[in-house]
Amino acid sequence: MATWKFIIRSVLFFLDLAMLLAALALIAVGFWMGYDSSFDTDLKNVIYKYDDPKSLADAKFNIRVWLIVVFWSIIGLSLGAVVTAVLGMISSVWPKRKGFMITYLVLIIVLVSLEIGCGVAVLVRRNSLHDNTNSLIDAMYTTNSVNDLKIIQDKYNCCGIENSLFNVMYCGPMSQKPHCDVAVFDSVDNTMMISGIILLVILILQTIAIILPVPILISRKKTYKYSYEPRVTQLADITEDTRF
């Protein structure tokens, strides 16, 4: 194997190894955050409380739908990354089977396309998330959900709603605390921004992983043909000369 091919395959192997470890870690953290009762217990008790008045129940339902869609999108993409990374590692250590590398290249292109699509969808639906968050906090104050409000206000160190009559009751005239609808959405938005930066780094690494196999796939082994015809012709000429 040529030295440059060995270097490319080595880099590709470690890129896929990093992608595999990151995907497995993301799956583990996702399930831990989603299903471990010890993680953010108070907030889960707020979102997954089902005996609320209709307006508050509808607002919580919309947030739950968001959480479920985002959660399973992350898990699904992570599982796809695991399969793709394993196939990439196999193709990098098995140079004689280009079929593995072609399959890997197709899968990682599909994976990157899905990741970009999910990122664009989240950006497009960002205003919807903002509206759902505002509706949730507004419904808590409107229905006077005392337990939910206490959890939210203690968690985010906030009070009231932006441009609302409830602010005098809950915040007081001299309060410097941010409004709860703003504080909650800012927290969610910051998390989305951090996730977007991480996704951008992953996409850059995956783009490199897409480019690396291309020189190997388009390269061809050089074949050498040895012709003995001149030697045969020379022997024939010598034979004719000896006849005379």
UniProtKB/Swiss-Prot annotation:
Keywords: Membrane, Transmembrane, Transmembrane helix. The chain crosses the membrane at residues 11-31, 67-87, 104-124, 198-218. It is a multi-pass membrane protein. It is found in: Membrane. GO terms for biological process: innate immune response. GO terms for cellular component: plasma membrane. The gene is tsp-1. The keyword Heme does not apply. This is Tetraspanin-1. InterPro entries: Tetraspanin/Peripherin (IPR018499). Disulfide bonds: none annotated. Belongs to the tetraspanin (TM4SF) family. Pfam families: Tetraspanin (PF00335). The keyword Membrane applies.
